[in-house]
């Protein structure tokens, strides 16, 4: 029985999707004005694992993750680079997809782009105005937060205590400081025509509209980074309640930050490490292993020592699996049985709010056991668990030359011709087969 921590209730709950054996999941994706940093990659990896494990449990999963390709940051960056917003957004969208594939996280079924849903956003905003949940001003359209009785339910705040967030504009013509923008009238950058003025949609409206357009109603899981809980996700809930009289999602899942030297990593602060740069130095599987060795809700303090630790751990896994794969080929072992006790442990850990650190410890134990005494069930179990975690060690193909080198090596050893034996042994060592 899968149990997950629901940020909406602040407690562990049994996972019961709205429709039996079918899961709809939406995760907030990047604003494509720059390459993602190593902290941005954490939700990409985690929710990929969520989808993989749900599929392992025989759920059908539809997974959407958006691309925010209209935003003030995109406009500012494009102007500085003297290119169009579309050119900038296209470049960094392609870069994001490329790095997501490299870290094994390109497991999306739908990747909606905000610019493809502008008409739907304008219609949505117009209906909120008609229903009294939004109002027009000279600067744009704003949402009346006071109209939502349980506003603050996700972030555990009361309206009277609200502080405006980073992405809430402090416009002087708002009714209340904490009202948030649905539409921003502007003369600068890319803009669209709407009945209340030319401009562009607010960030919070983009996601709620795309979620509704793709799934047509309440979804099972809405996810993202912990820093999106407020104001972004709170404001998505408010709009959904106003328009549809129900919450946007049944379960909300938030991933902890990855910080650099105890400081929040941020592109705007200029203290970020680009993920594309990290995986040029370290194996993408080592990055993934590092993330999964920490519980998804816990913060991670990144350092060179930390990633190097998991590079070594991954190298050990890869070497062990290659060595025993070669052994299986040599001895014509092709059984596909699993160690059922270990698989029960695996499922128990994953069912406990995706306790991946305990799964990584289980893998470490199985690797140690395998190196003590070969059991094909242990080998197959490690492969199965790693696959479900999206970690794919580079298992090398065993060629006829490799088998011949092994046989020649053994023969030379029998003949006590150690110089000749070393010649045949070296290519096997280079491949990690012995």
Curated annotation (Swiss-Prot):
The Swiss-Prot or TrEMBL record describes its family as follows: Belongs to the class-I aminoacyl-tRNA synthetase family.
Please classify the protein's predominant subcellular localization into one broad category: cytoplasm
What this protein needs as a cofactor is:
Zn(2+)
UniProt cross-references to PANTHER family, sorted A to Z: CYSTEINE--TRNA LIGASE, CYTOPLASMIC, CYSTEINYL-TRNA SYNTHETASE
Q: What does the subunit section of this Swiss-Prot or TrEMBL entry state?
A: Monomer.
Protein name as catalogued: Cysteine--tRNA ligase
Domain of life per record = Bacteria
State a single Gene Ontology molecular function.
cysteine-tRNA ligase activity
GO BP annotation list: cysteinyl-tRNA aminoacylation
Protein's UniProt keywords contain Nucleotidyltransferase: no
- Cellular compartments annotated: Cytoplasm
Q: Which reaction does it catalyse?
A: tRNA(Cys) + L-cysteine + ATP = L-cysteinyl-tRNA(Cys) + AMP + diphosphate
